[in-house]
Amino acid sequence: MGNWLLPEGLADVLPAEARRIEELRRELLDLYRTYGFELVAPPLVEYIDSLLSSTGSDLNLRTCKLVDQLSGRTLGVRADMTSQVTRIDAHLLNRAGVTRLCYCGSVLHARPADLLSSRELLQIGAEIYGHAGFEADLEIIQLVMDTLATAGVRNARLDLCHSGVMRAIFDADPQASRHAGDLCTLLREKDVPGLAELASRVDGLGEDTVRALQALATLYGGPEIIARARRELPAVPGMAQALDALQALVDAMPGVTLSVDLADVGGYGYHSGVTFAVYGEDWHDALVRGGRYDDVSRAFGRARPATGFSLDLRKLAAGLTPAEPARAVRAPWGQDPALTDAVRRLRRSGEIVVQVLPGHEQGLDEFVCDRELALQDGAWTVRTL
């Protein structure tokens, strides 16, 4: 095996792609700042107990583990940054009011999510802590849509769900809650026959529960799905509140293309309220996922309402129209103080200046040199090529 090969699911980022990713990162973090979000940068590696606090087994399976040679304790390479940012809010900042935090950093997965996924993601996201009302959910969703618009994603579609719908059904039927994992998997796959088969094997599962689960698998479509859910789902405690929360968001976003999928319950064990995914034209999977997760910070000794989102910046950049090559000024190499001063002034003004090294006058790179710095009448001036 050649020593230039990388492990499966990992890849180098070459100059043109790296430039596009970095441009996006700067644009998006600047956007988040205009909303009042503060940037934080947690470490790549933490004690495993901290990384996996109040998260499901899925994150545990995705986390690469190693032994700390200083303490002997098990460390984890982060597979998601949300719990780290939650720890910062709950334990380090310890603010009483609303806190808005954003972040961007690499995460590593022990296994790829699917055949088309990378094991190393550049995760960027934003979180609001300290407000339990729908206003925080709405602000986060508005920021998501602004994020994709800034990146140039066309025809973005918002898909809404609410973990409270599933929780209301499980709370009303303890027997169903014992099989929550299997039931949620079947619901995500819209597997109505599979739900019926599982229901036939589970003793004591209520008839209302079976009907509700089978109805959930078909409750996806436009905003009218909420009204249909009110008719078809049981009026158990918590159900009306969850559907009301979805309706409030729909009513607050009249200009957004959206759908409702009450079977999108992938984060049931983690989320505590509204959840969402956003899809873009020509992408095979959701570009952004997020939602409310009020219970996670309890593991850090301070329960706080929380809602947020994250996305993979590499995946986003790879699906966008390639950026035009950067325009640059070509300059000769030399030790003339006047030339050095002219190059310095151009660079300070934001221009890219590529000085041609001796013997490499025909070299190619990612820049398009449409101007050159030339000596005219004893002065270094920029002229168009």
From Swiss-Prot:
GO molecular function list: histidine-tRNA ligase activity
GO CC annotations on file: cytoplasm
Example of a GO biological process term: L-histidine biosynthetic process
SUPFAM superfamilies registered for this protein in UniProt: Class II aaRS and biotin synthetases
InterPro entries (alphabetical): aa-tRNA-synth_II/BPL/LPL, HisRS-like_core, HisRS/HisZ, HisZ
Cellular localization per UniProt: Cytoplasm
Associated pathway: Amino-acid biosynthesis; L-histidine biosynthesis; L-histidine from 5-phospho-alpha-D-ribose 1-diphosphate: step 1/9
Entry keywords, A to Z: Amino-acid biosynthesis, Cytoplasm, Histidine biosynthesis
HAMAP family to which the protein is assigned, alphabetical: HisZ
Subunit structure: Heteromultimer composed of HisG and HisZ subunits.
Family named by the database record: Belongs to the class-II aminoacyl-tRNA synthetase family. HisZ subfamily.
Other notes: This function is generally fulfilled by the C-terminal part of HisG, which is missing in some bacteria such as this one.
Official protein name in the record: ATP phosphoribosyltransferase regulatory subunit
Species: Bordetella parapertussis (strain 12822 / ATCC BAA-587 / NCTC 13253)
